[in-house]
């Protein structure tokens, strides 16, 4: 892995949008930037205002610091160089930090187009074959052919990128992300996130009616308790349905809640059916407010009337008439006084 630093061009024209610098080992060096391609390592050729970029506009000074590089920027232009939108005094060196924004050229007034040469500075570690070319610094005053960008020779068998064309801006951003550089670029529109996926479909919850048993299925032997809801009297109520549908019934509960309207006569319904109509034990006849099987039925007048069935004789009783609670009926078997007397004898 090579300790390098990079200049990523943001916006501007086409081509030359990513420059990677690797100074020679063990010695410092200087890179020049300007419109004189014969004197500079990075040629800045403006398309709009040629006079805004000097022949040698600025210099990058790289000095070894441990296993990394200390990079400073020095301005030599007549139009100015900005670091993080602050103009650098001419001839003054400023040490750069990872993520600094460099602008070569004057800062235009509000409402005008920005400079063509707007770069982001970053320090990275790359493999030699990851980039097609790395800048080799020129000697001061040297204008020989071969300086500037030179191709890096990859390892044996490794593919080499062509030098005829440069990567477009989106591809340059992808390269930066692939080597773990500058997370500040990730929210930008040019950043591509391969881990993105389409919207995941959420599971559709089952309707509450599917959680309990259906009214058509006969209840099992051990489910003998129920709660029967009697609604307020309504004169315009229609005929009651054959099978009152349960609102909610959990698989192991002995009590359930049934909704049943009143009959046209205005009287309350009797106790609920234990089995469907086809079963041999039919519910008591509706009408007359039939009491439960308790010797002394108190005829509860509440809106919700709780019924409990004897586990011995299958006879229905009002919970209030037998003196037990709904919770006790759920948790334990219930036997009427007659069945309890038979067991004792």
From Swiss-Prot:
It is found in: Nucleus. Gene3D superfamilies: 2.60.200.20, Zinc/RING finger domain, C3HC4 (zinc finger). GO terms for biological process: regulation of gene expression. Keywords: Metal-binding, Nucleus, Phosphoprotein, Transcription, Transcription regulation, Zinc, Zinc-finger. GO terms for molecular function: zinc ion binding. A zinc finger (PHD-type) spans 293-342. One of its GO terms (cellular component) is nucleus. CDD domains: FHA_TCF19, PHD_TCF19. The keyword Zinc-finger applies. Residues 31-88 form the FHA domain. Residues 190-227 are annotated as: Disordered. The keyword Zinc applies. Zn(2+) 1 binds at residues 296, 298, 318, 321. Potential transcription factor that may play a role in the regulation of genes involved in cell cycle G1/S transition. May bind to regulatory elements of genes, including the promoter of the transcription factor FOXO1. This is Transcription factor 19.
């Amino acid at each position: 892995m090579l300790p390098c630093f990079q200049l990523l061009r943001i916006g501007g024209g086409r081509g030359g949008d990513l420059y990677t610098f690797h100074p020679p080992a063990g010695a410092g060096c200087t890179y020049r930037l300007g419109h004189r391609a014969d004197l500079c390592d990075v040629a800045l050729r403006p398309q709009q205002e040629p006079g805004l970029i000097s022949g040698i506009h600025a210099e990058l000074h790289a000095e070894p610091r441990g296993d990394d590089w200390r990079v400073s920027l020095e301005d030599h232009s007549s139009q100015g160089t900005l670091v993080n939108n602050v103009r650098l005094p001419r001839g003054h060196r400023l040490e750069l930090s990872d993520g600094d924004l460099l602008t070569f050229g004057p800062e235009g007034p509000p409402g005008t187009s920005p400079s063509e040469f707007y770069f982001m500075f970053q320090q990275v570690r790359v493999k030699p074959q990851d980039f097609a070319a790395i800048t080799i610094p020129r000697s001061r005053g040297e204008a020989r052919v071969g300086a500037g960008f030179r191709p890096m020779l990859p390892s044996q068998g490794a593919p080499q990128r062509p030098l005829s064309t440069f990567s477009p801006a989106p591809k340059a951003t992808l390269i930066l992300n692939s080597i773990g550089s500058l997370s500040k670029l990730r929210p930008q529109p040019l950043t591509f996130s391969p881990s993105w996926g389409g919207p995941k479909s959420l599971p559709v919850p089952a309707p509450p009616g599917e959680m309990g048993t259906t009214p058509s299925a006969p209840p099992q032997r051990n489910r003998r308790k129920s709660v029967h809801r009697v609604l307020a009297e309504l004169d315009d109520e229609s005929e009651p349905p054959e099978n009152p549908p349960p609102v909610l019934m959990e698989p192991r509960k002995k009590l359930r809640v049934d909704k049943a309207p009143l009959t046209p006569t205005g009287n309350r319904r009797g106790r609920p059916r234990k089995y469907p109509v086809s079963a041999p034990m039919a519910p008591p006849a509706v009408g007359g407010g039939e009491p439960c099987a308790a010797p002394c039925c108190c005829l509860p007048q509440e809106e919700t009337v709780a019924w409990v069935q004897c586990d011995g004789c299958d006879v229905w009783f009002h919970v209030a008439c037998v003196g037990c609670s709904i919770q006790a009926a759920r948790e334990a078997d219930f036997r009427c006084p007659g069945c309890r007397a038979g067991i004792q004898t």
